[in-house]
From Swiss-Prot:
It holds the Pfam family Ribosomal_S5_C. One of its GO terms (biological process) is translation. Part of the 30S ribosomal subunit. Contacts proteins S4 and S8. The N-terminal domain interacts with the head of the 30S subunit; the C-terminal domain interacts with the body and contacts protein S4. The interaction surface between S4 and S5 is involved in control of translational fidelity. With S4 and S12 plays an important role in translational accuracy. Located at the back of the 30S subunit body where it stabilizes the conformation of the head with respect to the body. It comes from the Bacteria. Keywords: Ribonucleoprotein, Ribosomal protein, RNA-binding, rRNA-binding. It comes from Chloroherpeton thalassium (strain ATCC 35110 / GB-78). One of its GO terms (molecular function) is rRNA binding. This is Small ribosomal subunit protein uS5. GO terms for cellular component: small ribosomal subunit.
Length: 172
């Protein structure tokens, strides 16, 4: 039987790229006027099945982005990608954000917008159909997408759950 491909991920061993999804400016009203702060949501990935997201908050934009990248590297997950797409359809929710992802044939491309596209690009998914429903808040859409990708199960996971070998799963 095969060994479990999903093992503990060490971000230092991966060649991670970063992608900034959204920057938000916040204001706190104080006696002397307004004090501005920033938060940034960042997605990191190696384009080969590893992706993570992070939120950074600071008084300066660059500091918020740096904190977001640091946080994202702590939350990297592994996603099974088969022939450039996901193994099966996924529907995920986080808050009011809902994301539907469907596998697609090679050559279809990455049909996704905004935050969903950023996450799937960083994960290395080449062909997928997506639809974002409900809230379009980038924070919740990113979280819904990543939670959906965490729920993806490949043939190995299915065989382990059913207590059968991979050969039995493929032969029916």
């Amino acid at each position: 039987m095969l060994t479990n491909p999903r093992k503990k991920i060490r971000p230092g061993e991966l060649n991670l790229k970063e992608k900034l999804v959204h920057i938000n400016r916040t204001a706190k009203v104080v006696k002397g006027g307004k004090r501005f702060g920033f938060n940034a949501i960042v997605v990191v990935g190696d384009g080969e099945g590893h992706v993570g997201y992070g939120l950074g908050k600071a008084n300066e934009v660059q500091d918020a982005i740096a904190k977001g990248i640091e946080d994202a590297k702590k939350n990297v997950i592994e996603v099974p990608i088969i022939k450039g797409t996901i193994p099966h359809q996924i529907f995920a929710k986080f808050g009011a954000a809902k994301v539907l992802m469907k596998p697609a044939t090679p050559g279809t491309g990455l049909i996704a917008g905004g935050a969903v596209r950023a996450v799937l690009e960083m994960a290395g998914v080449k062909d997928v159909l997506t639809k974002s429903l409900g809230s379009s808040n980038p924070h919740n859409v990113v979280k819904a997408t990543v939670h959906g990708l965490q729920e993806v199960s490949d043939a190995y996971d299915v065989s382990e759950r059913r207590g059968k070998s991979l050969q039995d799963i493929y032969e029916g």
